[in-house]
């Protein structure tokens, strides 16, 4: 059966010498794995059109099991995103988080809308690192945990100016007066905790102009990766590349 569906490539894996297996998140929010034969060959016409983040109309044959890709009518290749290693790495973290948050046959129109929102904001100039923070925040519950950033987990105080760390022992932000109860708490600014809470609660439809300074953004990213590792046992492949790029940048200074 010939199928035509709009979607975004969220995963691409080499298969043999010349083929790829791609996964698209289609417009209905379903993950569709497709065999892209000869996609690694330049002459096939599929090499450029089977990269991560390509948004297009995918035409494929589907009977039983995995479909076979015939062609892609590209709507947006997000070519500039693919040229920037840092930006593409954080965008890959977004795609990987969304992919791994969904079961094989699960349908999530929200995740499709979230990914479209992420890519459109990156195109407008919003840092991909910030978009990865939003995706990680919005998908916590899919990995079986939540995190609270708006009050002290020990004293209950709701004055966010007093919050200075996140405690894995008490599963939440903690205030300066309670810090002595967890010597291993992860220290970060109250501004970081405040903005994490805002981004966690705010619907993506209400997120317009997004601008967060780099040091706060770095604290957000570090904490969220720690949360996913501690509470869900998650290790992201794309984060490994991000860590390598950060080390290279530090070594070059």
From Swiss-Prot:
Superkingdom of origin: Bacteria
SUPFAM superfamilies in the record: ArfGap/RecO-like zinc finger, Nucleic acid-binding proteins
Keyword DNA damage assigned: yes
Alphabetical list of InterPro entries matching this protein: ARFGAP/RecO, DNA_rep/recomb_RecO_N, NA-bd_OB-fold, RecO, RecO_C
A matching Pfam family: RecO_C
GO CC annotations, alphabetized: bacterial nucleoid
Disulfide bonds: none
Presence of keyword Nucleotidyltransferase: no
Signal sequence extent: none
GO biological process, one term: double-strand break repair
Keywords: DNA damage, DNA recombination, DNA repair
Family stated for the protein in its record: Belongs to the RecO family.
PANTHER family per record: DNA REPAIR PROTEIN RECO
HAMAP family: RecO
Protein purpose: Involved in DNA repair and RecF pathway recombination.
Protein name: DNA repair protein RecO
């Amino acid at each position: 059966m010939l199928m035509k569906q709009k979607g975004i490539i969220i995963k691409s894996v080499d298969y043999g010498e010349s083929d790829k297996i791609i996964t698209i998140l289609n417009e209905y929010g379903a993950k569709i794995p497709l065999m892209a034969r000869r996609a690694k060959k330049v002459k096939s016409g599929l090499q450029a059109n089977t990269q991560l983040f390509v948004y297009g109309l995918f035409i494929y044959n589907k009977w039983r099991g995995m479909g076979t890709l015939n062609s892609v009518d590209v709507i947006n290749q997000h070519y500039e995103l693919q040229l920037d290693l840092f930006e593409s790495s954080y965008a890959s973290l977004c795609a990987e988080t969304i992919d791994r948050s969904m079961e094989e046959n699960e349908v999530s129109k929200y995740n499709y809308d979230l990914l479209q929102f992420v890519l459109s904001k990156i195109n407008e100039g919003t840092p991909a690192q910030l978009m990865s923070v939003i995706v990680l925040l919005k998908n916590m519950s899919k990995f079986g945990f939540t995190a609270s950033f708006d009050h002290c987990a020990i004293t209950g105080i709701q004055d966010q100016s007093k919050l200075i760390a996140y405690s894995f022992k008490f599963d939440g932000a903690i205030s300066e007066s309670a810090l002595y109860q967890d010597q291993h708490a992860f220290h970060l600014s109250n501004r970081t905790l405040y903005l994490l809470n805002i981004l966690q609660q705010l619907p993506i439809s209400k997120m317009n102009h997004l601008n967060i300074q780099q040091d706060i953004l770095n604290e957000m990213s570090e904490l969220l990766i720690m949360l996913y590792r501690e509470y869900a046992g998650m290790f992201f492949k794309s984060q490994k590349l991000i860590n390598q790029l950060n080390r290279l940048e530090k070594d070059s200074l």
